[in-house]
UniProtKB/Swiss-Prot annotation:
Task of the protein: Required for maturation of 30S ribosomal subunits.
Source organism (scientific name): Thermotoga sp. (strain RQ2)
Gene: rimP
Name recorded for this polypeptide: Ribosome maturation factor RimP
GO BP: any one term: translation
Subcellular locations according to the entry: Cytoplasm
PANTHER family (alphabetical): RIBOSOME MATURATION FACTOR RIMP (PTHR33867:SF1)
Keyword field: Cytoplasm, Ribosome biogenesis
GO CC aspect terms: cytosol
Coiled coil: none
Record carries keyword Ribosomal protein: no
Highest taxon above the source species: Bacteria
Sequence similarity: Belongs to the RimP family.
Pfam families, A to Z: DUF150_C, RimP_N
Length: 150
């Protein structure tokens, strides 16, 4: 079966399982890497952070589906994980959800801002580095991610 078809079927089932478990799908990848084929499913918890238990329960259900459907003809590794502490910020929902968190935003013109997300209103992200506040239009963001705090 072609990789795109596998990915589509896996994503559909992954979204169903995630919804049942109160989770969301952040990303689904199916690719050949140096150690062989990897089916990587990244789950997210909209109410907080993803626990090891979340990954374990999701993985069990996904394995049942994959074994039953037998979509993948060759050997592969199933990886289930969270987006990580330095997760990418992908859109308005993430900026609202992570208000108060430390983030790094790189704009399309190459400027980099590191600070706490103060708000997201009408397409504008307000971020503060403790000394100054910056307002960044979401359309100007090239990439953004949370920063790990120690």
């Amino acid at each position: 079966m072609f990789e795109e078809m596998i990915l589509e079927k896996v994503r559909k089932e992954a979204e169903r399982i995630a919804e049942e478990q109160g989770l969301e799908i952040f990303d689904v990848q199916y690719r050949r890497e140096s150690r062989g084929w990897i089916l990587r499913i990244i789950i997210d918890n909209p109410m907080g952070y993803v626990s090891v238990r979340d990954c374990e329960l999701f993985s069990r259900e996904m394995e049942r589906f994959l074994d039953r459907e037998d979509l993948i003809e060759h050997s592969y590794t199933l990886e289930v994980s969270s987006p990580g502490l330095d997760r990418p910020l992908r859109g308005p929902r993430d900026y609202v959800r992570f208000t108060g968190k430390l983030a790094k935003i790189v704009t399309k013109d190459g400027k980099t801002f590191i600070g706490r997300i103060e708000s997201f209103v009408d397409g504008t992200i307000t971020i503060s580095d403790g000394k100054k506040k910056y307002e960044i239009n979401i359309d100007d963001v090239k990439r953004a991610n949370l920063e790990v705090e120690f």
